[in-house]
Amino acid sequence: EELDLLESRLKIRSKTNVSLINQLGTHIIQSGGKRMRPLILILSSKLGRDVDSQIVTDAAVVIEFIHAATLLHDDVVDMSEIRHSKDTANTIWGNKGAVLVGDFLYSRAFEIIVEINSTEIYKTLAHTTNTIAQGEVMQLMNIENTKLTEEDYMEIIYRKTSILFEASAKIGGIISACSSEQIDDMAKFGYHFGIAYQLRNDYLDYFGSKSMTGKNLTEDLSEGKVTLPIIHALEKCNSKEKLLIGK
């Protein structure tokens, strides 16, 4: 029931009188995502009390809009052509349209945050979106960096991926008036879930299938992204093999 309401609100809150935003926004939001982040928010909101279902749904919409915006921007940066087995928005409408509609979704998300009127939620999401941007820049800085350490890699995936899961779990606790200790525990769950989620994605990029991932295999390799499979391979291979991987 909550997910059905979420889908309805996503459609309503993404609509404008600008046709390109409607077309491109519908494409990214209805592209077959699993809604993992808003689902975590909804579930964590059930652990407390005094839950306002409208606020829960609106907060879940915010999380999904932020996620969709990052996907639009990521696909432009990575020059990706396929996501969830469909053409990416930048492939269909071009980079400019994808970036601008990503900006719209970010700003619409923060419009809704203002309506929710929770300083704690606002602070959490302001920090989260800023950290995501830092993570994306850190990843860009380390393209083809075969000296990237596992520690640095973990920091990158925390900033660009895990922190939104962390925020989702935390916000559910805030909405349902959980104790500070409970909210911290929820945030830790979101953190670890997000790390595991990204580790799995990075593994499947090499050892999965297109039917599982919805995108072409070894995209990370072709984009020069150094992920954990490459880091471990570099640790175990000889100098000749390292040179080959570096190329």
Which positions does each model-derived feature cover?
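N-terminal amphipathic/basic leader segments beginning at the initiator methionine
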Residues: E1-K11
